[in-house]
Amino acid sequence: MAKKVQALIKLQVAAGAANPSPPVGPALGQHGVNIMEFCKAFNAKTDSLEKGAPVPVVITVYSDRSFTFETKTPPASFLLKKAAGIKSGSGRPNTDKVGTVTTAQLEEIVKTKEPDLTAGSLEAAVRTIAGSARSMGLVVED
């Protein structure tokens, strides 16, 4: 018989830097999950990613206090900021442009995010990421 799901927890944790302090500790502690076990497993799984990159994770907690987790790819905004070499996006993206990204950079980002994107084709995915770039105040160049 399948285990009964007790909770579904969504967090964003820095790659390789999960520790019992907030936000991880309180979120898992209230469901009785072994926090250190999660931290060790998460850090081992995100070892190959860039240190400090925010990684969305979905943790499924079962009624016997066991858990499974699935990591996603870093947010598009993080990847776009890294590609453009900026610290943050524009507060007024329509008037203040803060950087530029090329179509080649967008395609690299799409390849990174491919498992999490629902776009039907590469071109559609590039258009999606280009829209995110424009909403951050980045100029998209061919």
Curated annotation (Swiss-Prot):
Task: Output the PTM entry.
Answer: One or more lysine residues are methylated.
Sorted alphabetically, the keyword list is: Methylation, Ribonucleoprotein, Ribosomal protein, RNA-binding, rRNA-binding
Per the record, GO CC terms?
cytosolic large ribosomal subunit
A GO BP entry is:
translation
Which SMART domains does the record associate with it?
RL11
Pfam families with a match to the protein in the record: Ribosomal_L11, Ribosomal_L11_N
One GO molecular function term of this record is: large ribosomal subunit rRNA binding
Q: Which domain of life is it from?
A: Bacteria
PANTHER family named in the record: 60S RIBOSOMAL PROTEIN L12, LARGE RIBOSOMAL SUBUNIT PROTEIN UL11M
- Return the similarity comment: Belongs to the universal ribosomal protein uL11 family.
Q: How does it assemble?
A: Part of the ribosomal stalk of the 50S ribosomal subunit. Interacts with L10 and the large rRNA to form the base of the stalk. L10 forms an elongated spine to which L12 dimers bind in a sequential fashion forming a multimeric L10(L12)X complex.
> Function of this protein?
Forms part of the ribosomal stalk which helps the ribosome interact with GTP-bound translation factors.
Q: What is this protein called?
A: Large ribosomal subunit protein uL11
The species this protein belongs to is Colwellia psychrerythraea (strain 34H / ATCC BAA-681) (Vibrio psychroerythus)
Gene name, Swiss-Prot/TrEMBL: rplK
